[in-house]
Structure formats: C-alpha cells, structure tokens
C-alpha cells in the first residue's frame, strides 16, 4: 500500500497546477530487479512499476509499466540513466538495452557512463498489453488492399475498430504520446534521477520531443535518430510515405539489375521490378511454398518487401529473398529470419495482435483523422495510380477514420523550445523523410543536426558511420552539442 501511495505522490507532481511538494518529500519506491537477459551472460535486469492510467486522476486506476536496466559499465564514472525507445508506436523496448552496446560499440566511453534503460511503453509488451482480438489479414500494417479493392479495405477498417472498441475501449482515451512521455518522467523520478537522457529512433523522436515540451528542465542529453515531421498531420504523413518507398523500390530494382547472375531479376531496372511485381501477383492467385507449413501469400511478400525497402543496405537480402521464392525453394539458413518479417509477432504471454492494437490506439488517440470516406476513395485511386507499390495501402482508409474516441490532447509541440538536442537523419530515409529532421531543427534552434547522405531508416549503430558515432558519443560523454550542424559522408 505504501508503495502505491508513493507512486501516486510522484504522479501528482506531473499534473499541471499540482504542487510538487508531496512528491519531493516522498521516498521513491525501491524497485525489485531480476535478471531477464536473453543469454545467461547478459547483465540485463527487469522490474515493474505502477503508473496512473489517467494522469488527470492519479489516485485512480493504475497500470503496470515494465522497464529494464543494463548497469553502467563503469559505475565510478556513472553519469545517470539513458532511456531508450526503438520506435513504433507499438514497439517493445524492454530488450533494447542489450543492443545498445552494439549500437555504440565504437564509443565505449559513452556506454560506460550510463545505466541504459529500456521500457515497454504503456499498453505494449509486458506493460499492461492491449488486444483487439485481431487475426488473419487484420494483423497487416498498413491496410493493404486485396480482392474487393477499396471497399474491402473500408470493411476491414470498420471491423478492426469494432473489435478494438469491444476489447480495448477502456484504454483508448489514455493511449497517447503525451501520457507515454509522462511515464518516461515517472521512470526518471522512481529511479531517483534529477534529469533524463534519451536515445530514440523513429517514433522515439516523437516521444523525445513530447518529453522536451512537457519537461524541458529535466532534459539532459537527448539523441533523436530518424525524425518524424512535427509539422505534418498523421494523415499527411500517410500520404507522403508512398513516393519515398516508390523511390526505394526503384533503387532496389537498379541494384538487382546490376547483378542478374545472383538475383535473376534481369539486367535492367524495369524488368527487375516487373519480376518482383509478378511474384506478388502469383502469390495472390496461390500462395508460394516456403518449405514449411506456412506458404507466402501476396500480403506476406508485400510486407517483407516493404520492410526491406527501409534501408539500402538490406537490398541484398531482398534480392535473395525474391530469387529464392521465384525458384520455389526454402529460404537459405542465413536469411531464414526474413520469414518472420511477414507479420508482427509478440513474445510469449503477450497477445499476438498487441503491436497492431497498441499502434492503432496511440495513432488514433493522438490525432483525429478525416471522416470523409469519399475523400479516402479519391486518395486511394490517385495513390494507386502514382505509387503502385505502397500507394494503395497508405493512401487509402485507416481505422482511425472510424475511431470512436476523439483525441483528448495533441502531441506536445516543441515550437520555440530553448532546449538543444542532437538530431540524426539520413537524407534518403523513406520512413521518416529528411524534411522531418529539418523541421525539427527549425523548431528547436539550439539543437544540432547530423546528416548522412544515404537512404537508410535509423542511422546510429544501424548504418556504420564513424562520424555519426563519434559525434553522438562525444555529446553523450560531455553534454556539449557540436558548434554547428554536422555533415557525415558515408
């Protein structure tokens, strides 16, 4: 009981207009840490805390928040905590601290200074996970059309919303980026830290900005990699996705055409693309055998192709994947993991649709979508014609168009912020286009932008670059941003 009251006291300090005195006088609860690493040698520890479901009523219902910790490699020089987020929304981050030593492998000095903290954000993974009870094609993201075209996607979107309303209506009003940022500050407070450092990728940049907006005085060193655009509405972001992936599809086709001997897709880009499109069409008629009991449907292949178009250094995997399926052979052992990309999965004990359910609750909970179905139809037709790979999925309708709960608060804005953070982005990122980093840089004039002229989503530790790693490492160690923006050649 005492632990519950202490957490409430900390939560009250986060409510605008509430005096923080009670929280300052409270003693943070002692978390119970247990080993939870993926290997016996791992030093990763896990714990859980309770946070308010609704921060406007912090004495009301509480939910569980699962966190993890990789202790600082050099406790004597420990700087504080480095909270991490892999993106999403909907992504589990509990295991991410185990990967940070690889992401910052060239910067051991930075790694030595922090307890690296992971979290499953609210309603995700082991943090009071939500489910909509989705199955089959409902587990696909985005809303790919199939037989029945646009009308079928409308029906599917309505069915998804109906199921989410039946199973997760209790969570809908509280699944917001702002509340997740408040959870982040709860973690900081419970761990007894005066400030928070943060490493966030993709949607993690949105979380980082929300925290900066809500708690500017508690920001220490923030690294935001692959930045969403704070000036776009969610619908605008959907409509801007397809041209960037169309460009990546063209780059892949040209890549494959340069090595017809390995990939067998032809010696020119047009032929290479036609053969990939042909494979998807064949799978739409009859699933492609996979060597096990789970053949590849057209939806499976589209999903895998899309994920491998996120970064140009995945093109060789995509070429081999397509070549193997065209030959009706099982995937070789070294790329067998690609089969797992056909759909989002969940760890044991977590509902299989948790990623999709949480993604929708947060996306639809942050911002209202248009309700005009005919406008979605027009967008679908135009997107399908101009961007045939991803246009039909992203330009069409979203379940958010039928969401029963109107958003309670927007994502907090950093416009005019006096806080400086380190931004990282590639110029050709298809998922979080470079415009997002430039817009964030303008809104946060004290920040610095590190740019890499490649086509890659997620840079630090994902696209090897000594300049990026050195710049981020120096900032995490010293707290000093570069004097000016940094351009890092690949």
Please report, for each region that a protein language model flagged, where it lies by residue:
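Alpha/beta-hydrolase fold active-site neighborhood
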Residues: 273-418, 464
